[in-house]
């Protein structure tokens, strides 16, 4: 049987089986009368009920026979349909299914048509309320999504400025790779922070850098001698003044370097003495020298190493320096050397 014949075949619906209704009266009529002395009216009524019951039984039997015939015919048709469907390809079934419109679309269209015909102001208000709720729900979802994204993108704030910064580890792997290593460029080394000099020999407070670069002092001394010789040979006034300034600055630099060396020596000797006293048990805690004490001891050590003539010159120079400092701190009226009190105070000359 072809698929077109199967689709165009008319099928008769099977009639529903009516439930057999048996009334109490028919049931009582079928039963034999219990009271023999009943009246004639009761006998006639029972006869009518029995006739009605027999008619109902005949009708039910006829309906049952028709239903059984229709069921048998349907079973035969179903068998033929199944045998023919087994021989149909899936492509033909798909085409047949696509030719029919889905029932859901039909139902929705019918419902929309019914709603359009029975529209009322109350329905419009309900629809507007529903739309407002839907918009509010979408806005809340969008705000939640944006807040979640901002929380993900923005790292949490630090507890304090000393706390380590939080950085995400989700970084793409770099697609660049070094094929040829560039040649190593020699870097300039600072002796103050060079680990080969400072770090390897007792830390930053040690005298390792000064010992390693002690030859610079010899260079400075040689340069100072060359400048003095050049000053003796030069007759130009401007050139002589420039050489004198340079010699003065260099001597001051050398004097400062010597003072620093002297202070370091004093501090190292003091530390050794304190460690020895603690080791012997004479002291429990060390005594740390103040900067003023270190400077005083360095000055005493400097004067002890000088000759008597040089020491006198140095003391005189130091006295003049202290007097000039005190004079600057005095008020203008007391800076004179003992003249008339009515005389006008001497004004300080400005240096150009």
UniProtKB/Swiss-Prot annotation:
Main localization, broad class: nucleus
Coiled-coil segments: 221-280
Membrane-spanning intervals of the chain: none
Pfam families in the record: RRP36
Localization terms from the record: Nucleus, Nucleolus
Keyword terms, alphabetized: Coiled coil, Nucleus, Ribonucleoprotein, Ribosome biogenesis, rRNA processing
Annotated stretches, region: Disordered: 1-209, 303-352
GO cellular component: a single term: nucleolus
One of the GO BP terms on file: maturation of SSU-rRNA from tricistronic rRNA transcript (SSU-rRNA, 5.8S rRNA, LSU-rRNA)
Family: Belongs to the RRP36 family.
Main function: Component of the 90S pre-ribosome involved in the maturation of rRNAs. Required for early cleavages of the pre-RNAs in the 40S ribosomal subunit maturation pathway.
Identification of the protein by name: rRNA biogenesis protein rrp36
């Amino acid at each position: 049987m072809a698929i077109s014949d199967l689709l165009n075949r008319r099928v008769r619906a099977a009639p529903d089986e009516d439930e057999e209704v048996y009334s109490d009266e028919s049931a009582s009529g079928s039963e034999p009368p219990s009271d023999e002395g009943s009246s004639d009216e009761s006998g006639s009524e029972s006869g009518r009920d029995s006739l009605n019951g027999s008619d109902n039984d005949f009708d039910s039997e006829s309906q049952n026979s028709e239903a059984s015939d229709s069921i048998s015919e349907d079973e035969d048709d179903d068998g033929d349909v199944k045998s023919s469907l087994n021989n149909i390809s899936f492509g033909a079934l798909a085409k047949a299914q696509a030719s029919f419109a889905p029932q859901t679309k039909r139902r929705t269209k019918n419902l929309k048509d019914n709603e359009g015909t029975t529209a009322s102001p109350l329905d419009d208000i309900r629809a507007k309320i529903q739309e407002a709720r839907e918009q509010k729900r979408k806005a809340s979802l969008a705000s939640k999504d944006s807040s979640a994204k901002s929380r993900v993108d923005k790292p949490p704030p630090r507890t304090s400025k000393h706390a380590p910064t939080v950085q995400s580890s989700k970084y793409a792997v770099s697609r660049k790779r070094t094929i040829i290593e560039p040649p190593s460029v020699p870097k300039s080394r600072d002796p103050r922070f060079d680990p080969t000099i400072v770090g390897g020999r007792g830390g930053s407070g040690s005298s390792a850098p000064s010992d390693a670069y002690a030859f610079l002092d010899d260079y400075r001394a040689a340069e100072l001698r060359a400048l003095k010789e050049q000053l003796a040979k030069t007759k130009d006034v401007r050139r002589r003044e420039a050489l004198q300034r340079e010699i003065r600055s260099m001597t001051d630099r050398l004097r400062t370097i010597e003072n620093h060396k002297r202070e370091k020596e004093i501090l190292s000797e003091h530390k050794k003495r304190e460690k020895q006293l603690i080791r012997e048990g004479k002291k429990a805690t060390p005594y740390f020298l103040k900067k003023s004490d270190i400077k005083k001891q360095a000055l005493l050590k400097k004067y002890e190493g000088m000759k008597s003539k040089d020491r006198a010159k140095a003391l005189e120079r130091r006295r003049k320096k202290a007097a000039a400092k005190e004079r600057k701190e005095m008020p203008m009226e007391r800076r004179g050397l003992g003249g008339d009190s009515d005389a006008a105070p001497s004004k300080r000359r400005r240096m150009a």
